[in-house]
Swiss-Prot record:
Consequence the record notes for mutating residue 13 to D: In MRT12; most of the mutant protein is improperly localized to the endoplasmic reticulum preventing the protein from interacting with its substrates in the Golgi and resulting in a loss-of-function
Parts of the chain that traverse the membrane: 9-28
Protein name per Swiss-Prot or TrEMBL: CMP-N-acetylneuraminate-beta-1,4-galactoside alpha-2,3-sialyltransferase
Any one Gene Ontology BP term: oligosaccharide biosynthetic process
Organism: Homo sapiens
Chief location bin: Golgi
Molecular-function annotations in GO: beta-galactoside (CMP) alpha-2,3-sialyltransferase activity; N-acetyllactosaminide alpha-2,3-sialyltransferase activity; sialyltransferase activity
Amino acid sequence: MGLLVFVRNLLLALCLFLVLGFLYYSAWKLHLLQWEEDSNSVVLSFDSAGQTLGSEYDRLGFLLNLDSKLPAELATKYANFSEGACKPGYASALMTAIFPRFSKPAPMFLDDSFRKWARIREFVPPFGIKGQDNLIKAILSVTKEYRLTPALDSLRCRRCIIVGNGGVLANKSLGSRIDDYDIVVRLNSAPVKGFEKDVGSKTTLRITYPEGAMQRPEQYERDSLFVLAGFKWQDFKWLKYIVYKERVSASDGFWKSVATRVPKEPPEIRILNPYFIQEAAFTLIGLPFNNGLMGRGNIPTLGSVAVTMALHGCDEVAVAGFGYDMSTPNAPLHYYETVRMAAIKESWTHNIQREKEFLRKLVKARVITDLSSGI
């Protein structure tokens, strides 16, 4: 009798397991289906609560008729804030108003619970962490810091600016305005020294990947956090070398020479949550899904990724140095070098036009502020 009860309970447990597994798999497939639609087809859009959006929204879920005026409820909410005062929740509130699918909660950096994050677990880099568990675990076991600095974490309201590398920054004298922000994010190896008048002198985060990292240790700002954006598995391997101060091999799958040393102690190093790359690419910009793999024209630029990160982690968001003007092919591409605008047309991975459309939506709806007016 006892054996029959045991077998019955075992079968019930097995059935329950199979049902739950089927439901989980079905939900996952439905979730992927929304991204796998052809980029030219109509995509059903839902808000963050799963409700279908109406015809007043575009295929991605953005409001079609964007207005620079604040929605009435937000105008009332922020009416009593003085000019220049930081407005808590401002960027995310406006983002949700024009894009109801937006859901703010998302950690800025990977922490020791990263393997529990379903949104990134099933995707390989750059859209997730699949296959990178051991490397990431080894890195985090040494860095042991997963947040902003305590001083920044304690702020009731955070004003952030993403400083792009665009030539539009030259001769704008925006340096002092940039330095007024609580968090100043810089990208790749864009220099500060010698350009302070236009780009400021403050750096809070420097987000990069191995090929984009500064190669001379003296170029790094002393008080900034070094943040890896992992676009391929070799990037995580490179960061492990850096954190453990091991020798970096130049032949480890990089498309150009990389830094062999980063003058930062492990607690000053972070790994960007790859969800922001995934969200920017497929949800906000609408790049081809390509089965969740890196492919032609489906990788967002680091600038758009940083903006996406800021929408989740900051109360107010601004940009400077953004925007490519393809009508002026001989204009400088970056503020610090002589490479011309035409070079960006040769990009295999980016879709500059789609990104421009995304950023223009944010500027028009006042979700972000464009200090250099390049977007």
